Amino acid sequence: MRQIKLIIEYDGTNYSGWQVQPNGITIQQLIEASLATMLGEPVKLHSSGRTDAGVHALGMVAAFKTGKLLPLRAFSDGLNALLPNDIAIRDAVEAPLSFNPRADAKSKHYRYTIYNAVRRSPLARLSSWHLRGALDIERMQAAASHFVGEHDFAAFRASNCAAKTTVRRLFSVSVAKDGESVIIDVHGSGFLKNMVRIIAGTLAEVGQGKKNPDAVPGLLVSGDRAASGITAPPQGLCLVEVFY
């Protein structure tokens, strides 16, 4: 028996998220089906986490066990031949049988992209949130600094979040301008449901002048979801990398 670790890139536009569910096609479902076709046996993928419908990934990590003695290249090449063109296996490596993609993850890097221009971009529409009014980047950067460290992020989670604790540690939160895009990079030890999207929505409201940068500490202390920013739409979010 061996365990194969996959690094997966996907465009989440056409899927009901990562995790297998009764209604809707998911990325996990398609990869498991492709593996079953390749190996002639049912396969269960275990992942580093999950992404919601419409969210993308450059570096989702998942692993599965198999007794097949195929070369590693055969797993990536074989899957890429079977999967649709909006899902790709970037790499396949052998991992210890004890490897747990979720429990062993030390941190994750997410990126949220805002397309900040008067006119919408057809090419950017599936990978960014279009906001017309000019955003104040310096105000957003000032607000972003308050998220760094260990905090209770109860005010920055979805109402249906089932996490046992809402305390999380963020190592860095940055905001940068790249042409007509505003890039928000968030690196942390763990995340609550919709946490990055609510942080992005809050920073956008700061950039629009709707919130003060110094309001963030109070929002964190309050634990009040209604007081924080809107949940930014899913298409702007991408899981960039999982660190072990």
Swiss-Prot record:
Q: Name one GO biological process term.
A: tRNA pseudouridine synthesis
Active site positions: 52
Q: Which domain of life is it from?
A: Bacteria
Is Cytoplasm one of the keywords? Answer: no
Concerning Pfam families, the annotation shows:
PseudoU_synth_1
Report the SS bond pairs. Answer: none
Q: What does this protein do?
A: Formation of pseudouridine at positions 38, 39 and 40 in the anticodon stem and loop of transfer RNAs.
Q: What protein am I looking at? A: tRNA pseudouridine synthase A
Which species does the entry assign this protein to?
A: Geotalea uraniireducens (strain Rf4) (Geobacter uraniireducens)
